[in-house]
């Protein structure tokens, strides 16, 4: 009995002596049950986003985190109702110009929740790269990239690894391709750009919780992907609103407008001046 008490006290000491935070960057398209454009423009998608966030937040704390920051990262950044989010979490809403991961200090792991595949991925649910209105494709040093790859590179620039990516099957494959060793959590399987086969909410949230705990436990062993500098970010732009979808796939415009930026900071190439 005395030995057991000492073990428990030791575990409690370890949890409190080495506090750490987890940063959850939440998008909507990859969340549980979201399969089409109509669902992300109203309350349905926001409610599903809240539920996935809460499953992830609770698991972070159960895994030993002493702080969890949630960034509402879909569109305007004003999607979830703060009253519906686990009160233990810190919630960031609204636009944060020039900074992808606001208030990352003290966090040892980043989770990309509700993410989707890059634009032009065949038959991938709601696939796009930052803008579904006018961005046809993006490349970093010649390699086609989406939000998962770029956000992982920016995370490296801040010294924090992406440990978990949560989304549809194609987003999970993309994450594994970009971040060797990353934990992935599949919430659904894409059928077309506007349809998918989903897990029940109960099963999906249980999977999110299990995968979150696994990823947080592995946070020191998942390597950060290393940017190659100078980096060139190439973006293929088409007229606003003309990213074409011929059901069930996206169709590439053969004559896009090209924008290129080169520099030694991926975050600055994407959104402007990086955090000092």
Please provide the spans of the model-predicted regions.
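N-terminal signal peptide c-region/cleavage motif recognized by signal peptidases
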Residues: 12-15
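Active-site rim beta-loop-alpha module in soluble metabolic enzymes
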Residues: 154-162, 166-211
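Active-site glycine-rich loop that binds ribose-phosphate moieties when present
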Residues: 132-158, 167
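Short catalytic helix/loop segments, enriched in acidic residues and glycine
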Residues: 40-56
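Positively charged n-region of N-terminal signal peptides that target proteins for export
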Residues: 1-4
């Amino acid at each position: 009995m005395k030995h057991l008490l000492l073990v428990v006290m030791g575990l409690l000491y370890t949890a409190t002596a080495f506090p750490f935070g987890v940063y959850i960057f939440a998008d909507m398209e990859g969340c549980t049950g979201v399969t089409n454009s109509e669902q992300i423009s109203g309350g349905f998608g926001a409610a599903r986003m809240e539920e996935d966030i809460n499953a992830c937040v609770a698991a972070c704390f159960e895994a030993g985190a002493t702080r969890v920051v949630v960034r509402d990262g879909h569109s305007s950044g004003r999607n979830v109702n703060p009253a519906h989010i686990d009160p233990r979490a810190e919630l960031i809403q609204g636009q944060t110009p020039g900074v992808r991961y606001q208030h990352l200090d003290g966090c040892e792991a980043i989770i990309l929740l509700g993410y989707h595949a890059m634009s032009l991925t065949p038959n991938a649910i709601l696939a796009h790269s930052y803008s579904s209105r006018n961005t046809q494709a993006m490349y970093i040093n010649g390699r086609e990239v989406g939000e998962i790859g770029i956000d992982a590179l920016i995370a490296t620039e801040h010294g924090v690894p992406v440990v978990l990516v949560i989304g549809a099957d194609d987003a999970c494959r993309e994450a594994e391709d970009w971040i060797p060793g990353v934990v992935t959590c599949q919430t659904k399987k894409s059928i077309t750009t506007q349809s998918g086969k989903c897990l029940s909410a109960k099963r999906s949230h249980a999977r999110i919780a299990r995968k979150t705990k696994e990823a947080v436990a592995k946070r020191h062993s998942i390597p950060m992907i290393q940017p190659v500098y100078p980096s060139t970010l190439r973006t293929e732009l088409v007229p606003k609103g003309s990213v074409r979808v011929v059901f069930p796939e996206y169709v590439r415009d053969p004559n896009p407008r090209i924008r290129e930026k080169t520099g030694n900071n991926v975050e600055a190439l994407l959104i402007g001046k990086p955090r000092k």
